[in-house]
């Protein structure tokens, strides 16, 4: 393998950009996240908030109110908001998968984790040491750092797929036999056991994603303050800026 090919492979595995980081102090900012990626991130974040809040009330509904059902449509509105957010979440995920093939190489990091590359795991360990306060300075990355890359695929993406499958399976039950939701996702229910099992796993999945979001927000803010490059502002402007 040529030196150039080896360098490119290591760069892809570690998130190092030869044009931005290796040139050192002469480069202070580089364009990373394209507009579709940034739009997806914030719309997806809003959808997750709506899904979590409405999902909680669907699982633990408020006390019954007196009067006619037609005059108290609160749960109807909650369910409607949940279904709309679910469609936005699912369609957004399909769009994000498409953009991984149409966008720049940073847009593919969410779905491409070089787990068979030694350099990648060295960088993962390095980031784990930094998050555990065992090292004073993290490495510099242009796209997702290697640990974030692992978490985004194996924790966020796979759990999102699970939530979409189980969610639409339950939706298909309500839409009745013969609906496209039931035809496409009806197989999920017998796979997991029965309808109540799907409800339980979907509910647990919600809390799993809530915990991930909390850790994700903490890690992003912490790295923005203590790390060597911008994080939060990068998902707004698209540009990664370096502090040193």
Curated annotation (Swiss-Prot):
GO terms for biological process: respiratory electron transport chain. One of its GO terms (cellular component) is plasma membrane. It is a multi-pass membrane protein. InterPro entries: Cyt_b561_bac/Ni-Hgenase, Di-haem_cyt_TM, Hydrogenase_cytochrome, Ni-dep_Hydgase_cyt-B. The chain crosses the membrane at residues 39-59, 73-93, 150-171, 204-221. Gene3D superfamilies: Transmembrane di-heme cytochromes, Chain C. Keywords: Cell membrane, Electron transport, Heme, Iron, Membrane, Metal-binding, Plasmid, Transmembrane, Transmembrane helix, Transport. It comes from the Bacteria. SUPFAM superfamilies: Transmembrane di-heme cytochromes (SSF81342). Pfam families: Ni_hydr_CYTB. Signal peptide: none annotated. It is found in: Cell membrane. The keyword Transmembrane helix applies. One of its GO terms (molecular function) is heme binding. Probable b-type cytochrome. PANTHER family: NI/FE-HYDROGENASE 1 B-TYPE CYTOCHROME SUBUNIT, NI_FE-HYDROGENASE 1 B-TYPE CYTOCHROME SUBUNIT-RELATED. Belongs to the HupC/HyaC/HydC family. This is Probable Ni/Fe-hydrogenase B-type cytochrome subunit. It comes from Cupriavidus necator (strain ATCC 17699 / DSM 428 / KCTC 22496 / NCIMB 10442 / H16 / Stanier 337).
